[in-house]
Amino acid sequence: MRLAPPSIDDGRHLWALARDCGLDVNSPYAYTLWCRDFAATSVVARGPSGEVHGFVTGYVRPDSRDTYFLWQVGVHAAARGRGLARRMLDHIGDRITGDGLAFLEATVTPDNAASRALFASFARDRGAPLEWTPLFETRHFPQGPAEHAPEELVRIGPLAA
């Protein structure tokens, strides 16, 4: 897999992958805009033919300029179990620490064992503290056919450059 920043043309692929992975899906427009405006803080994993097998989207928090917020991680079903999510996270970690950022944050539902393990291994291997705190409660989300689970904030850092 080749890791690189996304291009505008990747927006539709990120949308489809998010849908297929069962992530909270945003509009195709949002993913396309993301690939334009936040390409420098995101990554896509491409197979030999250029197809998108995974992505990480994130941004530098405007009110906390030393903190990267990881918004979504998606890995195609055929590429799971091969360490691709961790490889993309390491890629982002190297990029943000190289830019002088000290913290990585994300939100995770309490039942998402895979994401919790991913962030725990990242923090451990980087020798960085990891802290979990409640952030969004069910009441913060609109009620629909399925109630949205709460989201806890994971904060990792400070990260060494």
Where are these regions (language model features)?
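A short, internal acetyl-CoA/4′-phosphopantetheine-binding micro-motif in the GNAT/acyltransferase core
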Residues: Q72-R80, V108-T109
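Active-site rim helix/loop that mediates acceptor-substrate recognition in acyltransferases
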Residues: R19-P48, V52, T57
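Conserved acetyl-CoA-binding loop-helix of GNAT-fold acetyltransferases
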Residues: V75, G81-D94, A117, S121
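Conserved GNAT acetyl-CoA-binding A-motif
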Residues: I96-P110
